[in-house]
């Protein structure tokens, strides 16, 4: 039986593939699909964020797509912000 962390990791992979597979390339999340993903999957996070700038910031190799490693950088940003918010009184 998978642990809670293993389930969470598997869920991250599934979310990434749900959106990257829209264009048929499970290794690349293109801009329109990235926008759809972040507005659907983390609407609170992107309320005050310029999604175009976020995409450019995450696209470290400048190939106009977000690979899984670049996606994880966003997950870390969201996770850190969410953790910080959870400690606000």
Swiss-Prot record:
Ca(2+) 2 binds at residues 59, 61, 63, 70. It is found in: Secreted; Cytoplasm; Cytoplasm, Cytoskeleton; Cell membrane. InterPro entries: EF-hand-dom_pair, EF_Hand_1_Ca_BS, EF_hand_dom, S100/CaBP7/8-like_CS, S100_Ca-bd_sub. The keyword Transcription regulation does not apply. GO terms for cellular component: calprotectin complex; cytosol; extracellular space; intermediate filament cytoskeleton; plasma membrane; S100A8 complex. GO terms for biological process: apoptotic process; astrocyte development; autophagy; innate immune response; leukocyte migration involved in inflammatory response; neutrophil aggregation; neutrophil chemotaxis; peptide secretion. Disruption phenotype: Death at an early embryonic stage due to embryo resorption, starting about 8 days after fertilization. It is a peripheral membrane protein. PROSITE patterns: EF_HAND_1 (PS00018), EF_HAND_2 (PS50222), S100_CABP (PS00303). Zn(2+) binds at residues 17, 27, 83. Calprotectin (S100A8/A9) activity on TLR4 signaling is inhibited by paquinimod. Keywords: Antimicrobial, Antioxidant, Apoptosis, Autophagy, Calcium, Cell membrane, Chemotaxis, Cytoplasm, Cytoskeleton, Immunity, Inflammatory response, Innate immunity, Membrane, Metal-binding, Repeat, S-nitrosylation, Secreted, Zinc. The modification S-nitrosocysteine is found at residue 42. The keyword Metal-binding applies. Ca(2+) 1 binds at residue 33. Pfam families: S_100. GO terms for molecular function: antioxidant activity; calcium ion binding. Gene3D superfamilies: EF-hand. Its main location: secreted. PANTHER family: PROTEIN S100-A8, S100 CALCIUM-BINDING PROTEIN. S100A8 is a calcium- and zinc-binding protein which plays a prominent role in the regulation of inflammatory processes and immune response. It can induce neutrophil chemotaxis and adhesion. Predominantly found as calprotectin (S100A8/A9) which has a wide plethora of intra- and extracellular functions. The intracellular functions include: facilitating leukocyte arachidonic acid trafficking and metabolism, modulation of the tubulin-dependent cytoskeleton during migration of phagocytes and activation of the neutrophilic NADPH-oxidase. This is Protein S100-A8. It comes from Mus musculus (Mouse). The lineage of its organism: Eukaryota, Metazoa, Chordata, Craniata, Vertebrata. The gene is S100a8.
């Amino acid at each position: 039986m998978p642990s809670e962390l293993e389930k969470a990791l598997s869920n991250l992979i599934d979310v990434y593939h749900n959106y990257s597979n829209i264009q048929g390339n499970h290794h690349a999340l293109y801009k329109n699909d990235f926008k759809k993903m972040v507005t659907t999957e983390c609407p609170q996070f992107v309320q005050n964020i310029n999604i175009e700038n976020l995409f450019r910031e995450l696209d470290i190799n400048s190939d106009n797509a977000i690979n899984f490693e670049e996606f994880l950088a966003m997950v870390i940003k969201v996770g850190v912000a969410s953790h910080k918010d959870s400690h606000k009184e």
